[in-house]
């Protein structure tokens, strides 16, 4: 029996449509830069916010009344939840989904129960994928919610907790491989500290490094062809998390020789919590060669926490998509909606309203970003601004042909007196606005 009987399949109706259950800009097969929109964006709906979150917050219990969140046999409820999820994905017309292990299967009271429940639910997910054509963008393991992970998973002071987390990741990686997932994500929700008074930073970093090496080894052992992705976040739930931002993750990966093995999954709201723009985090990851995928959402600038609202800024998403297109587009990654309806959005149709509007935002941003790439005035200005480094003197500097002493002698001999030139920020901001708001 359908859970959303009043909702038909969402279709493209064009910019003049007034329907909140129709796309105004997302025309899945429309060609942009020679490739369909759906292939550029690779959009996914997440299992956890859409079907697991009960509408609770730290001040109140859940406000949603979802049938699968009631009482009953946990496995039967999980099976019903999966049926509802794929009904939603299909009617929404989204191509991908994402999950944590315990989103889709009851955790049980032991590792054996966990393994058996998860195995049965992977059978269910595989069947639904075959029937609907919906694909898995990425899988992951929830190694942060259970009280055993209060002090972390890989960074936990108890090696048995480390082993338990490794077992979950082992299972979730194997499930992702079986379901033909495009990526596997590692979010260190509690890989950090609350206070330095009881924390050995060197010890915990070594544990994290060992854990990630094991993950990489297992990827190659099972022949997983997708990307491994760390998801940076500066804090929350811990006071300080070790995967603070893209640059921090890169330093960690370099330390353990993993910079060619693991990339990043960048979340917009995590970027702003770290004091960065979403644009900054993407550009940084691209420049370091570790860009992988995106969690699309937004935070509230007046709140200092992770609100996970649906993206609604065409400007922000245009600049993000511009950087992604300039880098060659997604390889295995995509735009995963790590977004949730608000606690007062009680009706089932609200799930559609949030996703439809956000998918339209990304589609419009893609069109604007493609126009920027085709007439790349920003790159033209950058080429001009850095032109000196393409001249013989600039090239010799980067090639290491000068020591500090010989370079100082060169400056004295040439009586160098370089002058500042305009960075043209206001001009370039106007250029971007003309592309977005034409």
From Swiss-Prot:
Q: Which reaction does it catalyse?
A: alpha-D-xylose = alpha-D-xylulofuranose
> Binding positions for Mg(2+) 1?
231, 267, 295, 338
Span of the signal peptide: none
Gene Ontology cellular-component terms for this entry are: cytoplasm
Q: What InterPro entries does the record tag this protein with? A: Xyl_isomerase-like_sf (IPR036237), Xylose_isom_bac (IPR013452), Xylose_isomerase (IPR001998)
Q: Give the GO terms filed under biological process for this record.
A: D-xylose metabolic process
Q: Where in the cell is it found?
A: Cytoplasm
Query: Is Cytoplasm found in the keyword set?
Result: yes
Q: How is the cofactor bound?
A: Binds 2 magnesium ions per subunit.
EC number(s) given by UniProt? 5.3.1.5
**Residues that hold Mg(2+) 2 according to the record:** 267, 270, 306, 308
Query: Cofactors per UniProt?
Result: Mg(2+)
Keyword annotations from UniProtKB, A to Z? Carbohydrate metabolism, Cytoplasm, Isomerase, Magnesium, Metal-binding, Xylose metabolism
Tell me the NCBIfam families matching this sequence: PRK05474.1, xylose_isom_A
Q: How does it assemble?
A: Homotetramer.
What family is this protein classified in?
Answer: Belongs to the xylose isomerase family.
Q: What is this protein called?
A: Xylose isomerase
What is this protein's gene name? Answer: xylA
């Amino acid at each position: 029996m359908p859970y959303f009987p009043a909702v038909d399949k969402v279709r493209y109706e064009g910019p003049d449509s007034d329907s909140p259950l129709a796309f105004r800009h997302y025309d899945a097969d429309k060609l942009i830069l020679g490739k369909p929109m759906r292939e550029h964006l690779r959009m996914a709906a997440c299992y956890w916010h859409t079907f697991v979150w009960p509408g609770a917050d730290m001040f109140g219990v859940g406000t949603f009344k979802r049938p699968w969140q009631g009482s009953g046999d946990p496995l039967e409820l999980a099976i019903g939840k999966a049926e509802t999820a794929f009904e939603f994905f299909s009617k929404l017309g989204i191509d991908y989904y994402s999950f944590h292990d315990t989103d889709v299967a009851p955790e049980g009271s032991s590792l054996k129960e966990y393994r058996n429940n998860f195995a049965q639910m992977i059978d269910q997910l595989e069947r639904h994928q075959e029937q609907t054509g919906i694909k898995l963008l990425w899988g992951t393991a929830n190694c942060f919610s259970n009280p055993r992970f209060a002090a972390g998973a890989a960074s936990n002071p108890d090696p048995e907790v480390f082993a338990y987390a490794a077992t979950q990741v082992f299972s979730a990686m194997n499930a992702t491989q079986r379901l033909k997932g495009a990526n596997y994500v590692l979010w260190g929700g509690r890989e950090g500290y609350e206070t330095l008074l009881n924390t050995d930073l060197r010890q915990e970093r070594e544990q994290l490094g060992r854990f990630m090496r094991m993950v990489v080894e297992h990827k190659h052992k099972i022949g997983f062809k997708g990307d491994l992705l760390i998801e940076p976040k500066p804090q929350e739930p811990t006071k300080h998390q070790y995967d603070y931002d893209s640059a921090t993750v890169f330093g960690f990966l370099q330390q353990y020789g993993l910079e060619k093995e693991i990339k990043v999954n960048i979340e917009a709201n995590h970027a702003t919590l770290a004091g960065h723009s979403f644009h900054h985090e993407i550009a940084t990851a691209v420049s370091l060669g570790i860009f992988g995928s995106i969690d699309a959402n937004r935070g509230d600038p007046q709140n200092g926490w992770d609100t996970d609202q649906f993206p609604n800024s065409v400007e922000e998403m245009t600049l993000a998509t511009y950087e992604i297109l300039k880098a060659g587009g997604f390889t295995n990654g995509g735009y995963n909606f790590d977004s949730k309806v608000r606690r007062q959005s009680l009706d089932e149709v609200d799930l559609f309203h949030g996703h439809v509007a956000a998918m339209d935002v990304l589609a419009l941003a893609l069109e604007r970003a493609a126009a920027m790439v085709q007439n790349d005035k920003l790159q033209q200005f950058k080429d001009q601004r850095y032109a000196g480094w393409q001249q013989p003197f600039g090239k010799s500097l980067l090639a290491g042909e000068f020591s500090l002493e010989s370079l100082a002698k060169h400056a004295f001999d040439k009586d160098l007196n370089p002058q500042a030139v305009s960075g043209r920020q206001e001009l370039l901001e106007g250029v971007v606005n003309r592309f977005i708001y034409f």
